[in-house]
Amino acid sequence: FRFRLLVPVMYGIFAGSFIIFYVLGSIYEDRILIDKAFYVWVSVFSLFHISVFWSFMSELFSKEQSSRLFGVIAVGASVGGLIGPSITAIFSVSLGTDKLMLIASTMLLIPIPIIFFLQALKTKELNNEVLNTPISNQSIGGNPLAGFKMFFSNPYLLSIGVFILLYTGISSFVYFELKNLLSDFSRPERSVIWAQMDLAVNILAISTGLFATGRIVTRFGMPATIAMVPIIICIGLLVLAISPLLGVVMILQIVRRAGNYAVTRPAREMLFTLVNQETRFKAKPVIDIVAYRGGDMITAWLFTGLTQGLGLGLAAVAAIGAGIAGLWTLVGIYLGRWFERDNDNFKNSKT
């Protein structure tokens, strides 16, 4: 199967899946099983299609180009986060919620011609033909589960997985802390607070991605860049342990989300410019999905055990979270140093 066709075919499958769910929902009156299947699929799709997108980006751009451009590219996610809810609000009233799946399918088909255009630019404008054999001349084959073997047998990929696992752990800690503190507020008040935080996150993420991320990587290097948000979160959780106030948790949540969109996520995706095509398209989705969902599950159990099992309060849980953030920082520094070494043997090796 040609690498050139892999990403367009994946987007075609994504688009087709929404059409299938729409048709099934129209045919069958009893939709309980269909709705459950759709929920499971969306939970996987929400991570998988983003993973495929970033695999494609790390295929197009060199290490140096990714350092300059990935922050700007990531702004698209923040802009989409602003536009998406507006589209849903407009068309859900006039078309109904079911037909929104057709709109989602159409929006997934639009990038396909853009993908072919960008593939042509790789050698014509970006001058990246030296990164790999031209995409059209390579095939992907072998065991479709090879990504799991690549992940668990390669220390670099394992470290990326641990980094994602710790990120999801911190995310869950901050979210649960915030949720507990907001429990005393009414539902309208909570809605206003969440909306204000979302607005702050989008503004901060877009401005940072456009004007700062590339400069941060270029000036301070990858170790400092990828460890920047973890360090800030670690310090913030220590402050929260001393002063368990709602304002502190809100700031932590805003910094964590905006920092992930604008700095941590782009920096993390730059790490995959060092690996070969096979690893990029087989192991990366495994890392993104398994580590992310696994981190969610483990952290939920841990938080429940600490609060309900051991009866720990906000301050104690924040202190434990600070320790996790400290470990997250160390893993980030390790990955950043590996990235800057740019081991050519790793790039061309079989994983």
Identify the residue ranges that each predicted region occupies.
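Residue-level recognition of pore/gate-forming positions within transmembrane alpha-helices
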Residues: 11-18, 105-109, 168, 202, ...
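Substrate-agnostic recognition of the 12-TM MFS/MFS-like secondary transporter fold
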Residues: 34-93, 136-150, 155, 163-213, ...
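C-terminal ends and interior cores of transmembrane alpha-helices
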Residues: 12-31, 116, 213, 231-245
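C-terminal transmembrane helical hairpin of 12-TM major facilitator-type secondary transporters
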Residues: 223-263
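Hydrophobic core positions of alpha-helical segments in small-molecule transporters
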Residues: 9, 72, 102-103, 162-163, ...
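A membrane-interface helix-boundary motif in multi-pass transporters
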Residues: 2-8, 87-109, 189, 193-196, ...
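Intracellular loop-helix junctions on the cytosolic face of multi-pass helical membrane proteins
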Residues: 2-5, 23-26, 31-36, 63-67, ...
